[in-house]
A protein has these predicted regions:
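Glycine-rich phosphate-binding loops of nucleotide-dependent enzymes
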Residues: 2-233
């Protein structure tokens, strides 16, 4: 079966610095896949290379079998991929509902607001609150909701639980798990190992810009030497 998202031989640079070396990965429809690794290993660069924020100098990226490598990020977004940046990137001067409506303006298809609010009841309660008045967890929920309202085939999450209280992390893990159970495909980068392994069915370990290991999430739990070697845990 053809993968929903497939990358082969990605090589990406920042200036003259070679960051990714022949990175290949596959994500099937309705799958949750995680990229693990130390800080600076190349995980976020992998997401940005898939999304077109960073243009790979070599390699292939296919979304449902259609080549998208080299396209601008807005074109890749229209094709069905959304990236939620670590910085969240919401409009602080707009309220929650305005943020959502603005995100859906240029979408080829979009979710109705009530569907979004059904997944994120906190956002419905705060729908008239400005982005700057939201907590960090609420801002992250809004960032994810802004991506989902565009009805993406796959959503890329860059450090979605970073800096959030444990209670909010558990709530976001539950929400992401429900999205996955309903068929949403997710590729995430995250340092919170417990949260990641609670969500992902499969993981890639990125080390110094290379794919060092790929396998089921349960295997990572059962092989502490992998955690020690590549994550320092």
């Amino acid at each position: 079966m053809a993968a929903l998202l497939e990358a082969r031989g990605l090589n990406s640079y920042y200036g003259d610095s070679h960051i990714l070396f022949d990175v290949s990965l596959r994500v099937q429809k309705s799958e949750v896949v995680a990229l693990l690794g130390r800080n600076g290993a190349g995980k976020s660069t992998t997401l940005k290379s898939l999304m077109g924020v960073v243009t790979p100098r070599a390699g292939s990226v296919k979304l449902y079998g259609v080549e998208i490598a080299g396209q601008k990020s807005h074109a890749i977004a229209r094709a069905g991929m959304q990236l939620v940046h670590e910085e969240r990137r919401i409009f602080g001067s707009l309220d929650v509902e305005e943020n959502l409506m603005l995100a859906g303006l240029t979408a080829p298809a979009k979710w109705p607001l009530e569907r979004v609010y059904g997944i994120f009841p906190r956002l419905k309660e705060r729908r008239r609150s400005r982005g700057t008045d939201l907590s960090g967890g609420e801002q992250q929920m809004l960032a994810i909701a802004r991506a989902l309202i565009r009805d993406p085939k796959i959503i890329l999450l860059d450090e979605p639980f970073e800096g959030l209280a444990p209670l909010i992390v558990r709530e976001l893990v539950r929400i992401c798990g429900e999205l996955a159970a309903a068929g949403q495909t997710i590729l995430l980068v995250e340092q919170n190992l417990a949260a990641t392994l609670a969500l992902a069915s499969r993981v890639y370990i990125i080390n110094n810009g290379h794919v060092a290991h790929e396998g089921p999430a349960q295997e990572i739990k059962a092989r502490p030497e992998l955690l020690q070697r590549y994550l320092g845990i």
